[in-house]
From Swiss-Prot:
<keyword id="KW-0418">Kinase</keyword>
<dbReference type="InterPro" id="IPR010452">
    <property type="entry name" value="Isocitrate_DH_AceK"/>
</dbReference>
<dbReference type="GO" id="GO:0004721">
    <property type="term" value="F:phosphoprotein phosphatase activity"/>
</dbReference>
<dbReference type="GO" id="GO:0016208">
    <property type="term" value="F:AMP binding"/>
</dbReference>
<comment type="function">
    <text>Bifunctional enzyme which can phosphorylate or dephosphorylate isocitrate dehydrogenase (IDH) on a specific serine residue. This is a regulatory mechanism which enables bacteria to bypass the Krebs cycle via the glyoxylate shunt in response to the source of carbon. When bacteria are grown on glucose, IDH is fully active and unphosphorylated, but when grown on acetate or ethanol, the activity of IDH declines drastically concomitant with its phosphorylation.</text>
</comment>
<dbReference type="Pfam" id="PF06315">
    <property type="entry name" value="AceK_kinase"/>
</dbReference>
<dbReference type="GO" id="GO:0004674">
    <property type="term" value="F:protein serine/threonine kinase activity"/>
</dbReference>
<dbReference type="GO" id="GO:0006006">
    <property type="term" value="P:glucose metabolic process"/>
</dbReference>
<feature type="binding site">
    <location>
        <position position="337"/>
    </location>
    <ligand>
        <name>ATP</name>
    </ligand>
</feature>
<feature type="binding site">
    <location>
        <begin position="316"/>
        <end position="322"/>
    </location>
    <ligand>
        <name>ATP</name>
    </ligand>
</feature>
<keyword id="KW-0808">Transferase</keyword>
<keyword id="KW-0547">Nucleotide-binding</keyword>
<keyword id="KW-0723">Serine/threonine-protein kinase</keyword>
<dbReference type="GO" id="GO:0006097">
    <property type="term" value="P:glyoxylate cycle"/>
</dbReference>
<keyword id="KW-0963">Cytoplasm</keyword>
<dbReference type="InterPro" id="IPR046854">
    <property type="entry name" value="AceK_regulatory"/>
</dbReference>
<keyword id="KW-0904">Protein phosphatase</keyword>
Length: 569
């Protein structure tokens, strides 16, 4: 029977499905320039969500093809799937997106088989792609030399990256000035100075980005030039950024995914890795929309870390969650979040609602203020990789999710997020200046989320974290909702003097009612922090402020949230 088993046909059908997915993905991506040039901001948001949802949609379609095309008993004969893998390897070897094709195959395998049938013999737990490939080319870039004139250098760049600029001469003068401010004088005068830019433009939300590097014979600097569309005034170059930390934030895990046409994804990711060496390739793949492959690279990094270190899982620092239990590896910059079997009495959500909320985050504009998540099923870890106290707590609070099978710990379902310092813990150790900066950014995070039609729900300090760049980011999603679903109210005046002394409200409260006047004691036990936040962001305590945001959203307005400092604006 083995010699007649349709391994090649199954492999071909899986790859045909991948080609179909890539074609639809590219079609959405290639529309980004037109949407940007025509200022179709709401279409941009819809396209971003559609492209994210496309992957699972296409996996489902190909699963149906396979089940319709082959006898189920034959198709699900897992012992034969090493033959499918071998046939598939031969098919993808000549491709320029072969690493993505491996991840696609894995997704199809997991859609057909239970996770206890996963093995490297049947699927690509470890990649088969060589680090250096015979078909690998230099990245698709353009190189520019100043030839004694920085303005001439900038002009040459914008000659190649042609848009309907509103006032290009003004832009060129400003960018030349910013370039001189960014680099030491000797670098600006260095005859060996050059600029290398990736040819395709990156698009995201209301911006377009030219991405590359400045370099001479000794050093290099990342280079990003954001373009904005000023409605009625044309396209303008908004800034010139060479600071690695700022460029890293532009590619942050808190941002929506870029739309950029990359026929050879590994080339571009390697190019980005050269200018952002602190970024893991999983994050770089994710940042350009290949979030499933980012998940594959994350998993490979995790199993490599577990195999090569003595690190053990511990409970994550901070206040224990009422809905989620969170654990981490000290040497691996990630937290693992599982849903508890029983929630605290004050929580009215159920498990299905929590899952929906976390999945919602993937498809909305996170405006740099919500951590991206990856959802996993059936993680298996060596029992010896858990500290006993950590494993005991997980088994106690989530026995339906965490189980011990011999020497293996099975985690049936979890999310991963980037690890941050919880804001409440950060403030306990912060200097006066750091407290001021953190509370300023905390309020700004709430405002930016709200303007993007996201209401965090539970805005306690413990539900926000501080990144390595000092940015405040929201990461607890079990109570998020669209801002337009919330009914913001003023507290009605008391009917009688006794009302104010009562422990019960004298007014009715609906399920979606929120009273911003109640925020101060709810958010801040520390009176000094409460007064400081009121001075910085007191409008957040006014129901009319929130209603004004809702009105803007209902009018179709899309806010500007810049992932970089806007110098000279």
């Amino acid at each position: 029977m083995t010699q007649h088993w349709p391994a090649g046909e199954i492999a071909r059908m899986i790859l045909d499905g991948f080609d179909d997915y890539r074609e639809h993905f590219r079609r959405i991506t290639l529309g980004a320039r037109e949407r940007f040039e025509q200022a179709r901001w709401q279409d941009i948001q819809r396209a971003a969500a559609a492209r994210i949802n496309l992957y699972e949609q296409k996996v489902g379609e190909v699963n149906g093809w396979l089940r319709d095309g082959f006898d189920e008993e034959v198709l699900l004969e897992v012992e034969q799937w090493p033959l499918v893998k071998s046939a598939y390897i031969r098919l993808i070897d000549p491709r320029l997106d072969d690493e993505l094709a491996e991840t696609w195959y894995n997704s199809l395998f997991c859609s057909l088989f239970s996770h206890d049938q996963i093995s490297d013999g049947c699927m690509f737990i470890h990649t088969t792609r060589p680090s250096i490939r015979s078909h690998e080319r230099a990245a698709q870039t353009r190189t520019y030399m100043p030839d004694g004139s920085l303005k001439g250098l900038v002009r040459a760049i914008f000659r190649d990256y042609a848009f309907d600029y509103g006032d290009l001469e003004s832009d060129l003068s400003r960018l030349e000035e910013q370039l001189r401010d960014c680099l030491p004088d000797w670098v600006c005068k260095d005859p060996a100075l050059a600029v290398e830019l990736f040819v395709p433009v990156l698009y995201r939300n209301k911006g377009a980005y030219l991405v590359g590097r400045l370099y001479n014979s000794d050093e290099q600097w990342p280079l990003v030039i954001p373009l904005l569309h000023r409605e009625g005034h044309g396209i303008e170059a908004d800034a010139l950024i060479t600071d690695e930390a700022e460029v890293s934030i532009i590619f942050s895990f808190t941002r929506s995914y870029f739309m950029v046409d990359v026929p050879v994804p590994a080339e571009f990711v390697n190019f980005l890795k050269r200018i952002l060496p602190g970024k893991h390739i999983a994050e770089l793949y994710t940042s350009i929309g290949f979030y499933k492959h980012g998940k594959s690279e994350f998993y490979r990094a995790l199993i490599n870390h577990l195999a090569s270190t003595d690190d053990r899982f511990i409970m994550a620092p901070g206040v224990r969650g009422m809905v989620m239990s969170v654990f981490t590896l000290p040497g691996f910059n990630t937290v693992f979040k599982i849903i508890k079997d029983r929630f605290s009495p004050s929580k009215t959500v159920d498990r299905a609602t929590v899952i929906d909320k976390y999945r919602l985050v993937k498809s909305v504009d996170r405006v740099g203020r919500m951590a991206d998540t990856q959802e996993f099923a059936d993680f298996r870890f060596p029992r010896g990789k858990f500290e006993p106290e950590c494993l005991a707590e997980l088994l106690e609070v989530a026995p339906s999710t965490v189980a011990v099978e011999g020497d293996t710990v099975l985690v049936r379902h979890c999310w991963t997020e980037r690890r941050m310092i919880p804001l409440n813990l950060y403030l306990e150790q912060a200097s006066e200046g750091q407290v001021l900066e953190a509370l300023e950014d905390y309020g700004l995070a709430i405002k930016q989320l709200a303007a993007a039609n996201i209401f965090p729900g539970d805005m306690l300090l413990k539900n926000f974290g501080v990144t390595r760049h000092g940015r405040v980011v929201f990461y607890d999603y079990d109570e998020i909702s669209y801002l337009t679903e919330v009914n913001f109210r003023h507290i009605p005046p008391p009917r009688y003097p006794e009302d104010e002394m009562s422990g019960e409200p004298w007014y009715s409260i609906g399920p979606h009612d929120v009273f911003p006047e109640e925020f101060p004691p709810f958010l801040f036990a520390d009176m000094g922090q409460r007064r400081l936040f009121s001075r910085l962001h007191g409008e957040l305590y006014d129901a009319d402020y929130w209603k004004g945001l809702q009105a803007s959203i209902r009018e179709g307005k899309v806010i500007d949230v810049f992932p970089y400092r806007r110098k000279g604006r």
